[in-house]
Amino acid sequence: MALFNFFSKDKKESLDKGLEKTKQSFFNKLARSVVGKSKVDAEVLDNLEEVLITSDVGVETTLKIIDKIEERVARDKVLGVDELNAILKAEITSLLEESNSSDTVGFEIPVHPEGPHVIMVVGVNGVGKTTTIGKLAHQFKQAGKKVVLGASDTFRAAAVDQLIIWSERVGVPIVQQGMNADPASVAFDALQSAKAQNADVVIIDTAGRLHNKVNLMNELTKIKRVMDKVIPGAPHEILLVLDGSTGQNAFEQAKQFSVATDINALAITKLDGTAKGGVVIGISDQMKIPVKYIGVGEGMEDLQPFNRVEFVDSLFS
């Protein structure tokens, strides 16, 4: 039985399948690290440290996990290697709980008296940002929400075109002014349009030009300021999209975007095509930003609300 009603059997199977490469890689390394050992000793812990780091969990998070296991060894005196999986599972779940105080439940959104819920989406080109917006729009629509898209990534013509294609595919309206338009002006129009249509949620795409952080910071600050004038408190959510298959590069992007603007949610995509799923654990722990969605496949439904218990369950099943 699923631990949460909203987490259907289909979604759990999709999650299991999406994390298969990460799981196989992790447990193959783990099995090799304890071969010939009956209890957890210094050598096993050294090997485990290497397994976690090479699984893209990250050095700082790995050391936190190792410290916890060392405490357990010191307390219990003798710890069998057969107990290692259960202890690791518990420690990783606990780490994720610190950053994800409450799991994302389905595709529900808060209600604001001033107007629709506004999500500003940020991320570099190639991480699956536009696809994530399209899948979010689809799932919000499936949940009975009225959605409006705003094409404020006006730096690339392809970005606007891609978002138009997604709006047509999903069947939701889009506000766009084409390439080189003022991004803040597009966001302003999108929010005005959404209010006029009594929309429930507005999703604003933005340009992700990390090579010029000052320009990016100024642009995002201007977009936020303009949106706040239309709907006080907007954007309510600044969602950073990261490509999980890039491993530690995703972590570096998260750090850089956190300098550029106040990120308060993460979407980690492309986990199905990689063995680097451990990056979810490291980014969540180090950045202290909730992981809200994970991408575990190509399908429209394969952008899933992140559930820490189900995620760890799939890794250790």
Question: What does each model-found stretch correspond to?
Answer:
Residues 1-120, 138, 142, 146-149, ...:
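Non-catalytic terminal/linker segments enriched in charged/polar, low-complexity residues
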Residues 35, 93, 99, 105-317:
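P-loop/Walker A NTP-binding module and the surrounding RecA-like catalytic core of P-loop NTPases
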